[in-house]
């Protein structure tokens, strides 16, 4: 039998974020009692914290189909028209990284979200006319790592807006314990704590580490976390080699650095730096953003000495 990590299929199986789960369940129950379509939901937060999983669980709870599309794939009105043409009554449409949807497509979404209707231009030149088309009622769930890029008219059309942030150590430890048992790994409390410490309080990273431990045990017949973390270049607090390189770049400079300079020195695009590297370093107070640029803090310098 092939062993694999099984994602939660119900809200009861979802670990952590109980206040958020309760709010979602309340909205679902109210929509069922009122026999109305569940309000559109916007989920925002860092990568890997379960936004897609929550969308899937909502669809499961509604006993309906989940349609998934990336925001970056909605760049023309026809892209959105194709997406909603596949929707059946009561479906859930999940748009991941919804901030990447083209502005003109966002505007097209407004009447669809409001009244499930869309105006389409048919024909060309003098023979063209605007036709209003009905869309099957559905729930739109948007997910984003960059809430600030969601324009206000679009954000205002979401009835439920939830911040899915990092998890507590206790929540990550519980996940690691569950995933370890699913993979037939006999992890002791110290090993579970070590995995948690190296996960950046992010479920996706914790799952990734558990999978690598499973591979290590299959090949080497034993678990060696210290060796595994060294091979994966995952350091104290879960920082990876690119995070350390970022800190080292700032540490070598005597003045604040702009994002373009950092991008050039690291050879990494701005989007990756701002969305993958900086959020956790800011949260851990290892760097600061000032009007003049990014600077390393004393905590960041201490980390470089001790990691």
Curated annotation (Swiss-Prot):
Protein's organism: Mycoplasma genitalium (strain ATCC 33530 / DSM 19775 / NCTC 10195 / G37)
Q: Where does Mg(2+) bind?
A: 52
Positions of the region Large ATPase domain (RuvB-L)? Answer: 1-167
GO:BP terms for this protein? DNA recombination; DNA repair
Which terms in the GO cellular component ontology are assigned? cytoplasm; Holliday junction resolvase complex
Q: List the protein's name.
A: Holliday junction branch migration complex subunit RuvB
Keyword Protease listed? no
- Pfam families, alphabetized: RuvB_C, RuvB_N
UniProt region (Head domain (RuvB-H)), positions on chain: 236-307
